[in-house]
Amino acid sequence: MTLSGSIGAIVGGLYAAGYSPDEMEALFKSDDFYFWSTGRIQKDYRYYFKMPEEDPGWIDIRVEKKNDKLKLLPPTNIIPEEQMDFAFMELLTSTNAACKYDFDSLMVPFFCVATDVNKSEPAILRKGDLGAAIRASMTVPLYFKPIEIDGNLLFDGGIVNNFPHDIMKETFKPDIIIGHKVANDKKTAEPDDLKGQISNIVMRPTNFDIDVKEGIVLETLFENIGLLDFDKIDLAVKDGMKTTYNSIDSIRHLISRRISKETVQEKRKKFNAKKPELFFQNIQVEGVKDPMQRKYIIHAIKGNYDVISLSSFKQEYFKLIADEHIKSIMPISRYNKETGYFDLHLKVEPQKKVEVKIGGNISTKPINQGFAGFNYRTYKSRAYSLTSNIYFGRFYSSFKLGARIDYPTTLPFYIEGYTTFNRWDFFASSSELFFEDVRPPYIIQNENNTRFESGFPLKLHSKVYGGIAFSNSVDQYYQTDVVNKEDEPDKTTFNSFSTVIGIENNSLNYKQFASEGAFRYISVKYITGKETNTPGTTSPKNTPSTDSNHDYFLVQAHTTRFFNFTNVFTLGLKGEAVFSNKDFFSNYRSTKLSSPGFYPTPHSKSLFIENFHSNNYLAGGINTIFKVMPNFNLRLEGYAFVPVNEALPETKDYSPTTKFIENYYLQGMAALVFHTGVGPLSLSLNYYEKQDTQLYFLLSFGYILFNKRGF
């Protein structure tokens, strides 16, 4: 008989289910287990088609209306539960069929202890779904979301009884009890130590004493291993084995019976032979009242197939998890003797219709910005999303309003439309903490656009899209670097219409400071519009206002890819190419402002540097990443920008001239980055090859991201 509680339920449950110690050790060391324990999605299951446009949001707060009152529902768990829920189903569903949902019929009889949240008392789990029972027993409050079994909300069993030998004794009256204490004594938690605070809340005073006539307690003290430190499995195994070897004589003295290793292996082999292969046929959906919504979910999982394999279900499961309309899905399956397949029971929690996002960027540079987003979602046979957001700050401000409709047809597709108002003030972003920007550019860009887009998925990580946009941009700038208070800026207005078709592929693990996956795109745009230039006081005298029509094609291609050579070292490669037949605008600076730019690092997005803008260019570089910890790394990045037919301010009237390829410009970044779970915390030194200030120091928390432009 095996009895476990808290994290120990994973080990005890897997052993009882027919997993050998070597198999469990390999499992705990695997990449899959890392993803299960952190809630992050593996690259192979990141479904890009459903991803919304990127924003600098930190946390999502759901809003619910109850009793005519609005109620804010902040996140209740740090680690998303979908990975863990699917893992337990994948590992233990066939075991349930083999033991017929009776834990006494496992390879070794087993039960575990959870905590009933509402009754604050132990819940003994001896039958039912083994994966759900283990999931309940190890659900540490605040880290994982509680699980409901038979109408009872359950948490970590260690909350009320972290060493349930008394339950074992009263219920089963065993001849000998062998216990293993791995819980360290409580340490005083610091005010800012959330992990320590949670550990102390969970670890209540526990009686670990067993009468010497009734059994033995092994004790392993883990000085440097804390709650959920799964990455330290090697140390845990080493220390645990050492404790067992030191106690083996005492254990042998208590137990006279001997079983050979071969006998245990044969018993495990016979039990595992009872496990049917995982194929799924019937699907039931719980938690969704609307029949059209249930049909939407079932069709997303099965499509037109009658039976699906585990691999097919896993891929479609994570596609649904990526759907903004669904908050969580807990998969439970039961073996159907009549069909020979498993029936899927999906406990679905729809996303609340109303959601508020909070985020932005806080830094030592005056690019601080706040962000608030609002989403309203609903779905039946189709999925509907209404989205708006607002950015506010000295450097960048914006407002966006739009909607998206998803059609779950055989080839899914979406239609979306957005109206956006953008404003950048590059002069306001130019002051520095350590390196003075002696000649900051006075550039203010106001841009508004209305975009319509449609697209469909191309495999898991890609989508094909096409769209149109109406855009109006107004750039204000000076023609010289030295200006007087009375000077008036030049103003260039460009009213345009554009069409685009493109392919995007994205499997990156983070929206900024990524270290895994790839991002690629190629797009072709046709842009037509009217440029109006109104000279200011720094233009050459007698410069008239001008109107010019522009019609041109713009081809853009980009690739970023990371190669994980070891657990410590990753190499990233980035390349970008832009080609167009766009004519120059009325003067040098307006030409640069209307040209595409190269922004390979977050900080580069906050500056306007003329050297890195051109109508045609090639650019690329490398990114070396040294992982100090899974979420903490050192990054060294270097890039080169090669303009083609570069505009140069060589003529007296500031009109551009061209050279095919003559110059190249360098930029780079050295940074320490820690991914906190809500946003990146970074300390960086940035270099740009340009006149005057070339080094920029930045301490930043959050994201430097903007709403999209029209072209």
Place the predicted regions along the sequence by residue:
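Short glycine-rich, acidic/polar surface loops and turns
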Residues: 164-165, 197-211, 621-623, 657-659, ...
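Flexible glycine-/small-residue-rich
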Residues: 114-117, 220, 285-289, 348-352, ...
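A glycine-rich phosphate-binding loop feature that marks nucleotide/adenosyl-phosphate handling sites
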Residues: 257-267, 469-470, 521-523, 575-578
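Extended beta-strand-rich architecture
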Residues: 498-504, 508, 515-653, 659-670
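Patatin-like phospholipase
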Residues: 1-5, 13-329, 333-335, 340, ...
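Short, glycine/acidic-rich beta->alpha junctions
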Residues: 157-161, 198-199, 394-395, 446, ...
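Gram-negative/organellar outer-membrane beta-barrel architecture
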Residues: 311-312, 316, 322, 328-508, ...
